[in-house]
Amino acid sequence: MATIVVAMSGGVDSSAVAAMLHEQGHNVIGITLQLYDYGIAVGKKNACCAGQDIYDAKMVANKLGIPHYVLDYENKFKESVIDNFVDSYLHGETPLPCVQCNKSVKFRDLINTAKELGADKLATGHYVRKINGYNGAELHTGLDTTKDQSYFLFTITREQLEYLSFPLGGFTKYETRKLASKFGLDIADKPDSQDICFVPDGNYKTVINKIRPEANTSGKIVHINGFELGEHSGIINYTIGQRRGLGIAYNEPLYVVKIDPSNNIVYVGQESALHVHEFIIKDVNWLADEIKDHEKLAVDVKIRSTRPPCHAEISKLCNDRIKVKFLSKEKAVAPGQACVIYAGERVLGGGWITSNIS
């Protein structure tokens, strides 16, 4: 049997994975990352990697009789994820910290730690599938489409994918909870994490203001036709597609359609101004063969984790950039979010949406 490190967040998914692999006879080692201030985390519910979660992971490991280690990654998490999150908002973007965490902290460092422990693989509780294809491992969506997490894993490398294991890829959430209950785990009915783990009560502005007090610099709210409508209290308070809380009066509904951080301006317009035909993504990571120069490829893309995939055509630009052209216009494409590229259920790759949107 294999030696397998399980990334244990303290939730039902990773706990069920640890129990399942242990029952199969594998040598299981649990690792939990402490990612942010333990004082803030204590008693905080529905968040990943909180103080209660670390305790829950330890209790599951004790019940299973497996080794369990808690690694303090608070400083690295702040540098790689929280600071990036704050700067992204100041640049007029809508950040995606869970993907940055997977890329910069969880997978890279957990894999290194697992290898140092002599493990054959690292297992997680993500709802995705790894399928052995003709040219190596492929990342596919989870069978439970309501829980599929492939959107958040597009930054893993092909080499990392070979080492990873996703035992829940063929499970539904209901089946996972039943499995945890069968193993007698107290967390079988624990609610799923909802918040960004380092954002108390979902109020991200508190985090930004603490790190960048200058973030609330006021500026103009301007209609896309050029006339000024009012004043905003800081661009961090706005995101593309936002309608509520604009604080301006107009004869029809207005939406945030563009944020100009250089001039500290929030642009608003009618809903029709949100519809996008094409845009550019940068820092593209490929989990399949890279698209060739001058090639146009028909694919499906996801521009938000909560949206279904839509049909598009992609073509290669220079400097690891890809042009994405929708077959039908889509609404509210936000810089800073991810665009993940699919061929059916397979993840081909993905990148970060830039401000080059038309």
From Swiss-Prot:
Gene Ontology terms for molecular function: ATP binding; tRNA binding; tRNA-uridine 2-sulfurtransferase activity
Record-marked site positions (Interaction with tRNA): 126, 337
Leading EC class: transferase
Keyword tRNA-binding: yes
Chain sites annotated for binding ATP: 7-14, 33, 125
UniProt keyword Flavoprotein present: no
Catalysed reaction, written as an equation: S-sulfanyl-L-cysteinyl-[protein] + uridine(34) in tRNA + AH2 + ATP = 2-thiouridine(34) in tRNA + L-cysteinyl-[protein] + A + AMP + diphosphate + H(+)
Listed EC numbers: 2.8.1.13
Pfam families: tRNA_Me_trans, tRNA_Me_trans_C, tRNA_Me_trans_M
A biological-process GO annotation: tRNA wobble position uridine thiolation
GO cellular component: cytoplasm
Task of the protein: Catalyzes the 2-thiolation of uridine at the wobble position (U34) of tRNA, leading to the formation of s(2)U34.
Intrachain S-S bonds: 101-197
Family listed: Belongs to the MnmA/TRMU family.
Principal subcellular localisation of the protein: cytoplasm
Residue ranges, annotated region (Interaction with tRNA): 147-149
Gene3D superfamilies named among the record's database cross-references: Adenine nucleotide alpha hydrolases-like domains, HUPs, Translation factors
Name of the protein described by the UniProt record: tRNA-specific 2-thiouridylase MnmA
InterPro entries from the UniProt entry: MnmA-like, MnmA-like_C, MnmA-like_central, MnmA-like_central_sf, Rossmann-like_a/b/a_fold
Compartmental location: Cytoplasm
Source taxon at top rank: Bacteria
Keywords: ATP-binding, Cytoplasm, Disulfide bond, Nucleotide-binding, RNA-binding, Transferase, tRNA processing, tRNA-binding
Active site: 101, 197
